[in-house]
Amino acid sequence: MSIIKEFREFAMRGNVVDLAVGVIIGAAFGKIVSSLVADIIMPPLGLLIGGIDFKQFAVTLREAQGDIPAVVMHYGVFIQNVFDFLIVAFAIFMAIKLINKLNRKKEEPAAAPAPTKEEVLLTEIRDLLKEQNNRS
């Protein structure tokens, strides 16, 4: 079997195609969440704590010297990325919770199977023994 044919069979399996679609949707969803955090959530949060823009939070480790740029640790951007992550994680959690709930509804409990001949016979024997014990 040629490598191209093997790859084609691998790529056309349902799982791989589903995974590719999931990655594409996830990337688009990530952009939406990043915009939500940067443009919708962080500005009012910054206003609530005194008009602060989180992107501006930074610590300069070394000042610029001539042509060498300053070494800066931008922890405000990190805080914003943490918000991004938390929102994405919560959205994924809720989606999985919804999917699990829908799957549980699909899996209706199966009706109890009809008793086998042996079970019916044993039940009759039990009932007869109870009857005999009650007479005694």
Curated annotation (Swiss-Prot):
Keyword field: Cell inner membrane, Cell membrane, Ion channel, Ion transport, Membrane, Transmembrane, Transmembrane helix, Transport
Membrane topology: Multi-pass membrane protein
KW Translocase (keyword) present: no
TM ranges: 10-30, 76-96
GO terms under cellular component: plasma membrane
Subcellular location: Cell inner membrane
Matches recorded under InterPro entries: Mechanosensitive_channel_CS, MS_channel, MSC/AndL, MscL_channel
Pfam families from the UniProt entry: MscL
GO molecular function: mechanosensitive monoatomic ion channel activity
SUPFAM superfamilies named in the record: Gated mechanosensitive channel
Gene3D superfamilies referenced in this protein's UniProt entry, alphabetically: Large-conductance mechanosensitive channel, MscL, domain 1 (1.10.1200.120)
Family designation: Belongs to the MscL family.
Assembly mode: Homopentamer.
Function in brief: Channel that opens in response to stretch forces in the membrane lipid bilayer. May participate in the regulation of osmotic pressure changes within the cell.
Protein name: Large-conductance mechanosensitive channel
Source organism: Escherichia coli O127:H6 (strain E2348/69 / EPEC)
UniProt gene name: mscL
